[in-house]
Amino acid sequence: MKLGIVGLPNVGKSTLFNAITNAGAESANYPFCTIDPNVGMVAVPDHRLDKLAEMYHPKKTTPAVIEFVDIAGLGKGASRGEGLGNKFLGNIRMTDAIVHVVRCFDDDNVIHVEGSTDPVRDMDTIDLELVMADLEMVERRIDKAKKAAKGDKKFLQEAADFEGLRDWLNDGKSARSYEDVDIAAEYPDCELLSLKPVIYAANLDEDGFSNPESVSYYCQVEQRAKEQGAQVIPVCAKLEAEIAELDGEEKKMFLDDLGVAESGLDRLVKASYTLLGLISYLTSGEDECRAWTIKKGTKAPQAAGKIHSDFERGFIRAEVVSYEDLMACGTMAAAREKGLIRSEGKEYVVQDGDIILFRFNV
């Protein structure tokens, strides 16, 4: 699963990406400093995995990961191919969801392409570019369906569905908010940009990050996101870049001094994981404790297949204990004595935080 970090030039995208991945992507104070997308695999924070590692002292601890792509700054005219628009939009098309970084601070030393800070305007600018790019694709889809309908009448419905969507997009509304037809379900091959789920990362200065609700820019972003049914995560990209350099104990002390329980980046990564409909199950032992990524609703054999195809092919059963039950008992042996380790079959839907031992035979 892949998330694209997007936003106008100079809103803090690359700084945020660098903090998330600890990768030194070029970050400079001028538009289009990130021409090729930078890709980073990011560990998903999970206290459950940390606790398992404390319990087992394994040789190796492997967290779940999620992929972030830093996509160069979009601007007005991107949907018409202006600037490097076509390249940027193509990079967004390859992602599963969007993290839209919005500037929520004033700084005369960091040039805004519009000359002023207005987060709602910036949100609308990017949203409109994605909608305009989708309109072009939808028009082509309608033409193709109408031609196909001459030989097969079933394509008439497809043409009608996309004509309804075209009218919606023409009003400047995203495909995400279109309810007449479930485009994603009915036409899964249609990769519309404005259909992708989105999280807004409100990039604040240090003072604002400690108390985002006191910042009018943040409140504006929050209100607009609420109208869209989207989530907003407050971050301070510059500060997060410093936090990312600290080890666990130093990081905790730093956050305590700021008066926040969790870094904005940790919240953003977790929220992104949830946005994609992902959960983690855990495996434990002296060799390795590991979090495995699956889609919510995945059944036990398919979850086992994430470890190895043989596990799925020869699946017999899954021995499952919930994280909460294991922590309450203190050891796996104690959980077994209390009858808290369940034997589940092929129809079992794996739950977030399940600790599983798969039995298989090939």
Model regions and ranges:
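Amphipathic alpha-helical transducer elements in NTP-driven molecular machines
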Residues: 32, 46-49, 62-68, 82-96, ...
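Conserved G1/Walker A P-loop phosphate-binding module
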Residues: 1-111, 138-140, 145
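Glycine-rich, flexible loop/turn motifs
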Residues: 23-31, 38-40, 48-51, 80, ...
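Generic signal for short, ordered secondary-structure residues
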Residues: 14, 31, 67, 117, ...
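Conserved Switch II/interswitch segment of TRAFAC-class P-loop GTPases
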Residues: 40-45, 72-82, 93-155, 168-182, ...
